[in-house]
Amino acid sequence: MNIYIICAVRNANPERVHELRAYAVRLRSEGYDVHFPPDDAPQEDPTGEKICRVHRQAMRRADEVHVFWDVESKGSHFDLGMAYALGIKIVPVHCEKPDGPEKSYWKVMCAASG
């Protein structure tokens, strides 16, 4: 099974990236193929186009996306839209910031997975 992890990359807390990397390593040790954006995409891309292309290719192979949602991450919004459009199973793992009472993508993910 192929799993794509949606998480913040740019401006992400390095300690949090380390924790998420451990999650990816654990999934790999269980036999899953995992796309972890901080490690599996060329972060030195000056325009971001190559990053988007690499993510799109990985997303097309994904059976599931596991989401560590950070509402401030623009890349996470982009990736979630791809997953939703492709009809990939969305697994909400953690919401990085408290969610208010209003509509939100986190609530959409939780409702769609339930």
Predicted segments with their positions:
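Conserved catalytic or regulatory cores that recognize and/or transform ribose-phosphate-containing ligands
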Residues: 1-114
